């Protein structure tokens, strides 16, 4: 089954496409879902695209054995002008006179009010915007359940997360950053990598003697691992910024470049017994 939605009567523009495939067999239940969504914001250069997917399989192997797997994730790409509380696009647009042209005859921004006080032209936030935020996220979940005897069962499940993000931005010599920093251009790339998993093992026993008497016992053992790595590289005074952009930050003023990185690892092991 494929469905498609499109709304273009008024901005923002929103497009959605979905595809669903379901298979049912004697001992197998499987379904697949994919989705695409594209949003174009009211402000130019503002957009969001996301592709998502899911594959789910459940099966009964034996009378006493069940298993299943769930794989899902998404890829997302967004971009937006500078919309901040301080000196952002919306704030600047509210106060900047509409009778002043965005640029003069030489293509330079008119960055001042009538009386001569300095302020960044709000159209520069849109026309000079050059940034992208990309995320790819994948999750895998699986389980195995053993029905050992009447009322007694054991279930082990494992979930894995793989998450990778890349945020890039280029501030050329006409950007807001250059306006505030003596015409100095900037390029920045930030990457995040996360790997984590969670394993949960549950042993449960339920026995009913009559309407008023029942035994319910549960034992749980759980362990998890989380590994996060972040890296940021920032360059200033970029060469051939309109041609190379973020693709080679080494073509810049090496004396001003900065790099930073960090890694955080978390582990956990816990248990619980309840009767």
Protein language model regions, located:
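Residues embedded in well-ordered regular secondary structure
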Residues: 1-45, 81-85, 108, 124-132, ...
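Structured alpha-helical segments in the cores of large, soluble enzyme domains
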Residues: 17-23, 266-275
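Outer-membrane beta-barrel architecture
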Residues: 20-22, 33, 56, 141-143, ...
């Amino acid at each position: 089954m494929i469905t498609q939605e499109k709304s273009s009567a008024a901005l923002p523009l929103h497009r959605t496409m979905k595809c669903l495939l379901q298979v049912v067999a004697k001992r197998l239940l499987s379904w697949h879902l994919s989705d695409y969504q594209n949003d174009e914001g009211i402000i130019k250069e503002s957009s969001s695209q996301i592709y998502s997917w899911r594959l789910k399989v459940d099966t009964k192997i034996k009378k006493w054995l069940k298993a299943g797997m769930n794989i899902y994730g998404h890829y997302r790409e967004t971009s937006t002008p500078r919309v901040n509380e301080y000196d952002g696009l919306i704030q600047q647009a509210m106060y900047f006179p509409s009778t002043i042209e965005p640029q003069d005859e030489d293509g330079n921004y008119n960055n001042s009010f009538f009386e001569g006080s300095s302020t960044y032209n709000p159209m520069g936030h849109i026309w000079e915007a050059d940034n992208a935020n990309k995320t790819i996220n994948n999750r895998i979940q699986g389980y195995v359940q053993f029905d050992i005897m009447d009322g007694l069962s054991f279930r082990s499940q494992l979930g894995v997360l793989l998450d990778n993000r890349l945020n890039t931005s280029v501030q050329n010599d006409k950007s807001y950053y250059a306006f505030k920093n003596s015409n100095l251009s900037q390029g920045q790339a930030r990457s995040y990598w996360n790997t984590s998993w969670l394993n949960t093992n549950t042993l449960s026993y339920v026995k009913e003697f009559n309407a008023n008497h029942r035994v319910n016992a549960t034992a749980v053992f759980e362990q998890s691992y989380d590994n996060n790595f972040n890296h940021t590289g920032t360059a200033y005074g970029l060469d051939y910024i309109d041609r190379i952009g973020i693709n080679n930050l080494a073509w810049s003023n090496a004396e001003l470049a900065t790099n930073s990185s960090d890694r955080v690892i978390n582990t956990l092991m816990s248990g619980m017994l309840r009767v």
